[in-house]
């Protein structure tokens, strides 16, 4: 997969996604590739009534790098990763300390990785679903606590793409 543009097969009629694709197509000029560094919170949820994570996930699956929090260096890193790997990439906050209890419960015996060879990666949900084992939709817990604490169920904080990264070779940079 190389970064590409104009790919429309399989898109839903989601207005936000189509608007982003149309806007980029109309404004890319002579450029061949496009990337987005979006301000995904906190104003997005209150204005549009959902989080954009799952749409960002879909865009990264099309070869269009997307970073959150207007992370210009992050989206540049994703773009380089797509060019080098030919596959969707993700941008995660990495914690190299996996608690032994989590390792014992969720990792040990399921693969050959030792505790010292594991890490935890987190982000709200812009990772392409093709990179996830059992991907599913969720909601952004931190935003829910801040923007809708009185609601028993999430409303405007729904839309994250969640799941564990599939086992396999990875590259960090």
Residue spans for each PLM region:
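Anaerobic metallocofactor- and corrinoid-dependent redox/one-carbon enzyme cores
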Residues: 2-173
